[in-house]
Amino acid sequence: MLLSTADTIVGKKITKQLGLAKGNTIRARHIGRDIMAILRHIAGGEITDYTKMMAESREQALDRMVEDARKLGANAVVRVSFSTSMIMGGASEILAYGTAVMVE
């Protein structure tokens, strides 16, 4: 599956647009990690547990978007973007989305 944040894929011709491909995940924080994050925040620096959690969440959302695109019959997704939103205290959603297309 080819992915691009641009409207096109260099060297490929879009032959058909198949619609919106999307994938999401919702992750909740862990109370033990929150305590460590508070301490890290006070001391300054990167909160690596949250960085890792967000990176894993982006990959999972992207994998689910690719799966959705395959179900639509696509071999590529263009205009790939990510969105995040707070669902409730301590839980966030990451959404990956783009236009599922056929390219040759």
Task: Please annotate each region the language model reported.
Residues 6-9, 82-87:
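Short, solvent-exposed loop/turn elements at beta->coil junctions and helix N-caps
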Residues 88-94:
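A short, glycine/Asx- and small/polar-enriched loop/turn
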Residues 21, 26, 34-81:
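Short, well-ordered alpha-helical segments
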Residues 1-33, 71, 75, 94-104:
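N-terminal presequence-like segments and the immediate start of the first folded domain
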Residues 29-30, 86-88:
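Short active-site-adjacent helix-start/loop capping segments
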